[in-house]
Amino acid sequence: MKESVIRKLEGLLERNEEVMALLGDASVISDQDRFRALSKEYAQLEDVVAGFKAYQQAQVDLDSAKEMLEEDDAEMREMAQEEMKAAKAKLEHLEDELQILLLPKDPDDDKNAFVEIRAGAGGDEAAIFAGDLFRMYSRYAEANRWQIEIMSCNEGEHGGFKEVIMKVSGDGVYGKLKFESGGHRVQRVPETESQGRVHTSAVTVVVLHEVPEAEAISINPADLKVDTFRSSGAGGQHVNKTDSAIRITHIPTGIVVECQDQRSQHKNRAQAMSVLAARIQALEDEKRRSAEESTRRSLVASGDRSERVRTYNFPQGRVSEHRINLTLYRLNEVMEGDLDAILLPLMQEHQADQLAALADEQG
């Protein structure tokens, strides 16, 4: 392992011991904000510190085995050869693990996310599939103990959604769901199809990280056009009695957000503003990424969201993840929320890309 990497790991080990001591300090324990921040830092250091300690121990084992090679006893030398082989293999494995653990973390990965699902080509069938994807993400969120809140929805005439925006809250939400942005294509026989022909429909998914108030970019009120209108869709006697729905247009970017899920105009406006802030931030992030990564491929879909990322073929029970050429014949499980079968390989490929980029930078 490079000396510079060893030095970095030694610094993290030192910091880990420092944080551990601080967490036992009475003045820190009484300051809840500081205690919480240090606890989070300690948890983030845990894996890399454990990996480095295991690496150090493997290095000690290798050195001991080398010393045993000097023994006169042939049996001892043979044992030393075996121990050296095992220690070298362990060091190699741990070095790979530590390289991944040291990759720069996306600061947005721990944030909550807005998931926007929109029916594209395919009419009613696209809206029905948008509803299926909403259910799939809801199941996945449930399995991860995340919370879901519907921010806005426009139901399809025959089920599903023309558009639905959900907020997903919990640990590491954006880090996992960010790979879902892009075009999702479905191939299946609609219930109304009497000839049994397979139809192809499309749905686009956009995943944006939430922008906390403290980090929110400044939005000039003069740049906003705010319209109120009457809610449509489900809602019982309340519907059409008050102009509680909100449409906000950000004039400089042309971004439009509608929220009508809450009965209060104030709540709808607050929700619309949070989605608007996320979309504007995503636009800024995309500009920055384009400048930084103009020559590097990215598994996180580009800003136009038109890239086809996945196909769901119902007659064959097949899911094809086009970005990494992954094909799974586990369609039912995926639609029931078993997304890790796709997301984990995507994350691993993303890490491999990062490692390759890091190697290029280091020359």
From Swiss-Prot:
Modification after translation (UniProt): Methylated by PrmC. Methylation increases the termination efficiency of RF1.
Database matches in Gene3D superfamilies: 3.30.160.20, 3.30.70.1660, 6.10.140.1950
Organism of provenance: Shewanella baltica (strain OS155 / ATCC BAA-1091)
Highest taxon listed in the record's lineage: Bacteria
Gene Ontology CC: cytoplasm
Keywords annotated in UniProt: Cytoplasm, Methylation, Protein biosynthesis
Protein known as: Peptide chain release factor 1
Residues recorded as bearing N5-methylglutamine in the entry: 237
Cellular localisation: Cytoplasm
Region annotation (Disordered) ranges: 286-305
InterPro entries assigned to the protein according to its UniProt record, in alphabetical order: PCRF, Pep_chain_release_fac_I, Pep_chain_release_fac_I_sf, Prokaryotic/Mito_RF, RF-1
Molecular function in Gene Ontology: translation release factor activity, codon specific
HAMAP family the record matches: Rel_fac_1
Biased composition, class Basic and acidic residues, residue ranges: 286-296
Its biological purpose: Peptide chain release factor 1 directs the termination of translation in response to the peptide chain termination codons UAG and UAA.
Similarity comment text for this entry: Belongs to the prokaryotic/mitochondrial release factor family.
